[in-house]
Amino acid sequence: MLIFIISIIITIASIIFLFETVFNKNSNTINNNNNSNNNNNNNNNNNNNNNNNKNNIKENNIDKNKEIKIKEKLILNNNDPKENDLKYKEEFNNFLNKFSKNQEYGYKDNLIDNELRNHYNNNNNNNNNNNNNNKDDQFPKLKDIVYLDHAASTLASMNQIEEISKELKNSMFCNPHSVNPIGLKTKEEVDSIRENILNYFNAPYRQYSVIFTSGCTDSLKKVGEYFAWTKNSKFYYSLESHNSLLGIREYACESIGGSSTTSFQPIPSLYFKCNNNQFNDILEIIGNNDDNNNESYSLFGYPGQCNYSGTKYPLELINRIQKKYPKCKVLLDAASLVSTSSFDLTKYPVDFMTISFYKMFGYPTGIGALIVKNDSGEKCLINKKYFSGGTVNVSMAQERFHVDRPSLSERLEDGTINFMNIISLKHGFNIINNQLGGIDNVKLHTFSLTQYCKEEMLKLYHSDNSKQQQLCIIYSDNHFKDSSKQGSIINFNIFRSNGELFGYNQVEKLASLSSIYLRTGCFCNPGACHGYLNLSKKDIEQHLKDGHVCWDSKDILNGKPTGSVRISFGYMNNFNDVYKFINFLKSNFINDHKFEKEVIKSNKKINNNLCDISDNISCSGSCGGSCGSSGSGIEDYQVQYSNNIKEEKEEEEKEEIENLKNEKDNDEVLLSEIYIYPVKSCSGHKVVNDKWELVPSGLKYDREWTIIDQSGNYINQKKLPILALIQTEIDLINDKLILTAPEMKVLSIPLSYYPISAFDQIQVCGDKVDGLLYGDKDFSNTSGSSAGSGGGGGGNIDNISEWLYQFIGKRCYLVRKSPESHRKSKVDSSNEISFANESPYLLINEESVSDLKKRIIKDNPDSVPSDWNWISKHSFRANFIITGGKAYQEDLWSQFQLISKQQNDTTQSSSSPLVFNSVGDCNRCKMICINQKMGIEEREPLSTLASYRRSGGKIIFGQHLNFADSIKRNNSHTNDTALSSNESSISSSNPIFLHVPSKLKVLSERY
């Protein structure tokens, strides 16, 4: 028995052993086959555990007292390129610690926590299920840019666009006025959207109507146009209102027929401060003008939020006015307010409210709403004259008879509404309500970013002198402590280290180079703009005389700014955007003189203009001195260095300057090439003969033609880079202007022919220039072959406009400067210019171009030198190209003469040397970033120029010139003498020619 039991035990043990052996063998086989996967999974699990532990620690530290549950669907990803940057992480943690805990800032833990979550879980594989909600996926175009112009227009998410697209693909809609099933369904959808809008703003049941418009401006216009104005009415408005609200003033004046003192009353922003005393001041103003006549209504209009400064005005004022003066109806411009804040129509039952939906969720544009309290609409919006399809119950063609529809929305919506875009609105509201957890989350998120950004901006100072100069001045009525008083807008200007202001146009230019997109100007809010900038009526009138208008580049006039810079935040912004913006300010404006041209001065006279300057040093356009014909080199140079140049570079440059002190420079500076640009913004024509004629406006035929759009504004390469591909040629022998372009027939235009159509509204840099337009009746020739390959090219060309249209793809026209036009130079009013921007002549130095290219190659180590071959002298569109000498020495000259090589080599000459004055540095814009070979816009060379070639905040390269005189060479005298004005005047009877090549001799320098 014992033996039997032992036998059984041995058998069982053998079976177990055999089973384990087989199992282990199979397991090892599986493990071998999936070794890499298991390793990856183990690593992922470890990483996930580590990350989860980190996140738990972070969330426990930052998120102890949650008041609002984290919205899992909203993940705002920082995607910071500097994940290992300790400074970045430190700043990010400081930001989170402050704005997730400190309740005085009004922040409750929501969107920022999601941002934190995504930041630390960026590489966590367990977070893949949320990838469709992060910033990169929802806003892929923001990957490499920082968008800070949400007050103008926010952005639509990919989810929103996809849902709209899906509905358009799967559903069918038609005119809601049709009574077929599809039309009825469409009308139901539109009415449903009306209800959604009223619910979103918590409107009392059946007390409000939604009238769809093309936008907030159209809504305001309708109120002004339809309002029940009488001779006893008055229009009150906040001084800090948008132009669209101010425009109602014209309806009031026209309808009331009174003067400015009786028709309207502007209210200073000070009166809107949220306290009883200021409210009483406003109520007193209304009371002083209140009419007891029950038939008269007045209108009080103000913005819920100032689009200039972000100041929020007290909404309680609505109730106060309505309670005390029921005949004074209140109009709220809520476009800026509701973009990042809520509004409650039950709490603040305003009579009329206007909004634009693209400011709320980016798409669709062209849709707004006028939200009307029904009782106020029936009593006050009664002056509508026009009726149209959809607005009447019945009308007659034979006589003046029609009956309006009873409901406000039907009566005030003329024609077929934009039903497709209206239906798209629901997807925008879904983004706010569902994915973002409500507009209050958006407000808290954007306000936190705004607060932090403002605080960081105010920490920035220039620190290179004994008296610290703050970098930014912020225009606001409050301290950004309360989200009920301040929105997500920061308006500011930037100080230079010397206390002067940077022009806002220069700030925008540098921001664009850093892929930061913001807004500059006055933002269509003249009251706020002029008030904050302390601009008087006299200042504004003088600005207008000086040619300054809205949207131009004149940012500083008479030492005062004409506008400012505005940044604004949307829900898709995050800490990384603020971080990049603050670093942009630090790297581009702090101690701004380090970006300026470094000044090299000479104590001794120099010969033949040879101001010997190192290739690595740029000189200032504010240098000076005297030059003569004696001496053979450079002596006793004094170099003024920026205090912030790094020590290594400073020592290297000092050593190079010391070498230059003892060097005898025999380089000869020559005018080597002349270019004219017959058609403004098209390619240039190189002078191939040895001379070219000068005329009062500059080089003959230079910028004598321009291309304009249908509005009469000239078109340049910044608007249409393809213009760079239009080649121009002046054929003097055959009297032709010749235009060629890829795959187009050659177009030739007689030089001696002037068009018969006068056109005097051409806008060039703020000036109105008289021009002659080539119309259908004007003559031109086209050759039978195209300029590019293919032969056929542009097809039949009946006129010049058709040729331009076939190549450009846009309807535009060619205009020639009228012979009677005598437009004055921007930099020297004693000189004429044609369609040029500022001066008759522009000069650049080949050596300066070469130095710039070296810097570009050095600053872009990932590229190869050939990548930058497209950057050349042609990028700068100069008339005069000089060679020889040193880079940037042209900045030193105040006056020089050009001596023909023929004159230099012979004792007799039929013409005299020509004298030119330097009248200013050329302020560069993104025009130089147009690849002249490809007709596309690039980032360089403006980006590199901005790092070392600034003067007074402007980015400069090249010199503006004017023609001063010709020189009579008299063998009996050793000195050069200038001709009298009669002798030197440019006229057909006394033509003056500039020769190529010519030797350049400096007559004087600039200090």
Curated annotation (Swiss-Prot):
Residues 33-55, 121-133 have a biased composition (Low complexity). It catalyses: Mo-molybdopterin + L-cysteine + AH2 = thio-Mo-molybdopterin + L-alanine + A + H2O. Pathway: Cofactor biosynthesis; molybdopterin biosynthesis. It comes from the Eukaryota. InterPro entries: Aminotrans_V_dom, MoCF_Sase_C, MoCo_sulfurase, MOCOS_middle, PyrdxlP-dep_Trfase, PyrdxlP-dep_Trfase_major, PyrdxlP-dep_Trfase_small. Its cofactor is pyridoxal 5'-phosphate. One of its GO terms (biological process) is Mo-molybdopterin cofactor biosynthetic process. Residues 33-60, 117-138 are annotated as: Disordered. Keywords: Molybdenum cofactor biosynthesis, Pyridoxal phosphate, Transferase. Residues 816-995 form the MOSC domain. It holds the Pfam family Aminotran_5. HAMAP family: MOCOS. Sulfurates the molybdenum cofactor. Sulfation of molybdenum is essential for xanthine dehydrogenase (XDH) and aldehyde oxidase (ADO) enzymes in which molybdenum cofactor is liganded by 1 oxygen and 1 sulfur atom in active form. This is Molybdenum cofactor sulfurase. The gene is mocos.
